[in-house]
Amino acid sequence: MNIPCFVVILSLATTHSLGEFPLYTIPEKIEKWTPIDMIHLSCPNNLLSEEEGCNAESSFTYFELKSGYLAHQKVPGFTCTGVVNEAETYTNFVGYVTTTFKRKHFRPTVAACRDAYNWKVSGDPRYEESLHTPYPDSSWLRTVTTTKESLLIISPSIVEMDIYGRTLHSPMFPSGVCSNVYPSVPSCETNHDYTLWLPEDPSLSLVCDIFTSSNGKKAMNGSRICGFKDERGFYRSLKGACKLTLCGRPGIRLFDGTWVSFTKPDVHVWCTPNQLINIHNDRLDEIEHLIVEDIIKKREECLDTLETILMSQSVSFRRLSHFRKLVPGYGKAYTILNGSLMETNVYYKRVDKWADILPSKGCLKVGQQCMEPVKGVLFNGIIKGPDGQILIPEMQSEQLKQHMDLLKAAVFPLRHPLISREAVFKKDGDADDFVDLHMPDVHKSVSDVDLGLPHWGFWMLIGATIVAFVVLVCLLRVCCKRVRRRRSGRATQEIPLSFPSAPVPRAKVVSSWESYKGLPGT
């Protein structure tokens, strides 16, 4: 496929659009035309810097992003939750035991979590044993509480890292962001007060393993760097570059979103927050190889055209389109006026939309005004057709739009954070506060004598009150009965005696045995 290279080379433009490729190049302005001979025609070298004087090249080493580095933005880790397993038993009067199991939480420490994680990954049986529910004990008429603290490790727990600020992003974090994990605090708070997130690698040395060393050639003008050819032969200008630090490594962001790092880049402007870098993958590398091959092929076509012109001693408007500089920068423009070949030195600027240079029918905008053709001829193979339309040779290529779509689909700016603030979980409940956490032995506590009733002292007081009340009622009733008897006895003594009308014979009274013997008949 014949790939128009001028739609690809981003690094020579001066604007700061992300991921946009120049559609075309046109002179900023055209001044005086100078007649030349055919032997003065020259093909532009689009692999060199566009700036005058930046022709000296020297080899150097630079750092760029690894291909497919997005896979390294996932930071593996684990969550650590403090759990208190509790077994509570009560033995009643007849020896019946009731057991209740409970679970509470406590806030763990980083050191204890790291130890528990090492136990788990190494297969240490202590980790599994720490999660078991404690064996309950019992005591007659007492409540025995047995507790056991343990740390629950859940792994892997993957979070995303923002390579711009080395912050971690996950919905499990209270604000969606953990920004203080570097360098002194090796853990992140979560939405649960009793759960911590820790990275698998305590030193986090592998998190930013996203750079690779490459070799290129610098384009120099004295001690000043104009740009460089990367390892694939693709020229990149430092125009429009800004300083940007990734994962603690200082570097520069080129205007097309490419990030590189080398010593003394001579760039002093810091990037704004909306200037992001583009991903780097194998597909982009392949496209760059195609670009370089196509640039070379375009130059070969231009040289073939020049050879044909010199051999035939004839030049056409269409052939002049091969001599246009395909990328923004300094170059030459050619035209034919009154049968003479003309040239002028110009600076080519980028064109992103055809409407920018073709605002209306029959108008080719150069600078701030429409350029008038001479007998239907403009420059670089551009002519005005019989119907008044401006005809640009590159506009007739159907492959241009296809390749534009291909290239635009191949560039994705890396936008962070990827976590939506609305997806952040809310806090649910308060956690118990514990201090001086370690892996303790099973703890057992035995209560005082318990009769099996909740708040039995209170109920005993109520029972004693009821008994006292009943006793009091009984005493009152007894007292009331005695009082009634006394009153009834007094009423009987006050009743008057009645005498009968007939005499009642008196009984004989015998005072003693001697008197009894002296009675008649004895």
Swiss-Prot record:
Any single GO CC term annotated in Swiss-Prot or TrEMBL for this entry: viral envelope
Protein name, entry field: Glycoprotein
Glycan-bearing residues: N221, N338
Lipoprotein recorded as keyword: yes
Post-translational modification: Glycosylated and palmitoylated by host. Glycosylation is crucial for glycoprotein export at the cell surface.
Entries under InterPro entries matching the protein: PH_Rhabdo_glycop (IPR055448), Rhabdo_glycop_CD (IPR055447), Rhabdo_glycop_FD (IPR001903)
Mode of membrane association: Single-pass type I membrane protein
Main location: virion
Domain of life of the native organism: Viruses
Positions on the Virion surface side per record topology: 20-455
Assembly behavior: Homotrimer. Interacts with matrix protein.
Gene name tied to this protein: G
Family, per entry: Belongs to the lyssavirus glycoprotein family.
Signal peptide coordinates: 1-19
Use case: Primary surface antigen capable of inducing and reacting with virus-neutralizing antibodies. Almost all human and veterinary vaccines are based on the functional aspects of the G protein.
Subcellular location: Virion membrane
Physiological role: Attaches the virus to host cellular receptor, inducing endocytosis of the virion. In the endosome, the acidic pH induces conformational changes in the glycoprotein trimer, which trigger fusion between virus and cell membrane. There is convincing in vitro evidence that the muscular form of the nicotinic acetylcholine receptor (nAChR), the neuronal cell adhesion molecule (NCAM), and the p75 neurotrophin receptor (p75NTR) bind glycoprotein and thereby facilitate rabies virus entry into cells.
Transmembrane segments: 456-476
Other information: Its mutation dramatically attenuates the virus.
Pfam families named in the record: PH_Rhabdo_glycop, Rhabdo_glycop_CD, Rhabdo_glycop_FD
SUPFAM superfamilies assigned: Viral glycoprotein ectodomain-like (SSF161008)
Lipidation (S-palmitoyl cysteine): C480
Segments in the Intravirion topological domain: 477-522
Keywords: Glycoprotein, Lipoprotein, Membrane, Palmitate, Signal, Transmembrane, Transmembrane helix, Viral envelope protein, Virion
